[in-house]
């Protein structure tokens, strides 16, 4: 029996995850990307694999599965990853109350979390600002990669292990039945075609995307130069604004009180979708962010005012100032507007669109891809 073939369009994290899952299923896989390398949201994020941000049930389980796949891949390649866990710190009574409630909730959900008083936080994470610190909630689940390194090296890994073939600088402009077209007359065919085009709604199926409950999110990011060897975070660290951002926190009974306090004290932050996190890679660089602006089109300029707001808030819990910043940039990712967490469509027979992970691509893609291949594909 002839082996089934699959084409994946897009070499970001969703496309790479689909290529892996299809290969394991037994497909011969080719990946086409319009650029010389992946250069979209997949390389512009924190590199946080973030189960704590996912609600209990299918999404949390998917995040844990994705994390474990990252660990498997890192063990078989030169991709760096580290299960650092995460720390949410509290500097006022409302934040501390929410963290206490989340500890109870997460323990009930059998997550690996631990509530730390201020003394314990400082003993384990001495760079955390001690002034007004009440404590923190540590979760052991979270893992860090350097997205730039990981997304660059994953194609090589997939080729070596699964014989996935990559075709760069190939912009697919049309799909007809089982055939993709590149430029005037270059064509390739496969039994299955999977479109993982990220925030590019305009090239393939633009009429369909125009009807979908999907938009885009622009986020501004910053990264320090390599910090001194004694400047080590030891975990991914988040401030109180992050407690308002993730759906896994929404059931904390005191969250409305914290929301009210933040609205009174940080209305400019909430209006610009800002919450503040920091993650350190193997080069000792610290990635910091971020802002959230929603729409279909954006100005191609960064706002230094927004970057300053992020750094100002960061200094409430970490001693990182403007002088350390080496790079700033923005990323754009697709975001569903109907509350769903992924978009899986089949506009034609044996053609599938996978999109709309809403900024959780690093956290969910590998697990989601396995689920799609198991349940949606022949």
Describe the role of every protein-language-model region:
Residues 19, 23:
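Gly/Ala-rich phosphate-binding loop of Rossmann-like dinucleotide-binding domains
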Residues 46-124:
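Dinucleotide-binding Rossmann-like beta1-alpha1 core, especially the glycine-rich loop
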Residues 136-176, 188-192:
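Helical element adjacent to the flavin cofactor pocket in flavoenzyme catalytic cores
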Residues 273, 281-287, 293-378:
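C-terminal catalytic lobe of FAD-dependent flavoproteins
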């Amino acid at each position: 029996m002839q082996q089934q073939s699959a084409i994946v369009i897009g070499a970001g994290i969703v496309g790479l995850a689909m290529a892996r899952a299809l290969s394991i299923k037994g497909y011969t896989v080719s990946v086409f990307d319009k650029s010389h390398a992946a250069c979209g949201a997949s390389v512009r994020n924190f590199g946080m694999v973030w189960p704590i941000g996912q609600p209990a049930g299918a999404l949390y389980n998917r995040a844990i599965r994705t994390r474990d796949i990252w660990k498997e891949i890192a063990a078989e390649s030169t991709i760096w990853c580290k299960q650092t866990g995460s720390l949410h710190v509290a500097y006022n009574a409302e934040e501390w109350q929410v963290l206490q409630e989340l500890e109870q909730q997460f323990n009930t959900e059998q997550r690996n979390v631990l509530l730390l008083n201020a003394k314990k936080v400082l003993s384990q994470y001495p760079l955390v600002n001690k002034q007004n610190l009440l404590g923190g909630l540590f979760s052991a689940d979270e893992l860090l990669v350097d997205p730039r390194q990981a997304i660059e090296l994953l194609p090589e890994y997939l080729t070596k292990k699964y014989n996935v073939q990559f075709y760069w600088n190939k912009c697919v402009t049309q799909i007809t039945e089982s055939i993709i077209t590149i430029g005037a007359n270059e064509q390739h065919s496969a039994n299955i075609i999977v479109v993982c085009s990220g925030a590019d709604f305009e090239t393939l199926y633009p009429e369909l995307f125009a009807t979908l409950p999907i938009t885009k999110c622009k986020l501004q990011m910053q990264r320090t130069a390599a910090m001194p060897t004694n400047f080590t975070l030891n975990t991914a660290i988040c401030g109180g604004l992050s407690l308002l951002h993730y759906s896994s926190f929404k059931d904390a009974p005191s969250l409305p009180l914290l929301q009210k306090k933040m609205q009174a004290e940080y209305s400019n932050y909430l209006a610009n979708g800002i919450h503040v996190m920091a993650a350190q890679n193997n080069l000792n660089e610290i990635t910091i962010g971020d802002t959230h602006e929603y729409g279909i089109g954006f100005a191609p300029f960064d706002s230094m005012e927004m970057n300053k707001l992020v750094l100002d808030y960061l200094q409430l819990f970490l001693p990182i100032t403007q002088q350390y910043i080496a790079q700033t940039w923005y990323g754009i990712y697709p975001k569903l507007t109907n509350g769903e967490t992924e978009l899986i469509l089949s506009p034609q027979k044996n053609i599938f669109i996978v999109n709309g992970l809403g900024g959780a691509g690093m956290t969910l893609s590998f697990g989601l891809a396995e689920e799609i291949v198991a349940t949606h594909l022949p």
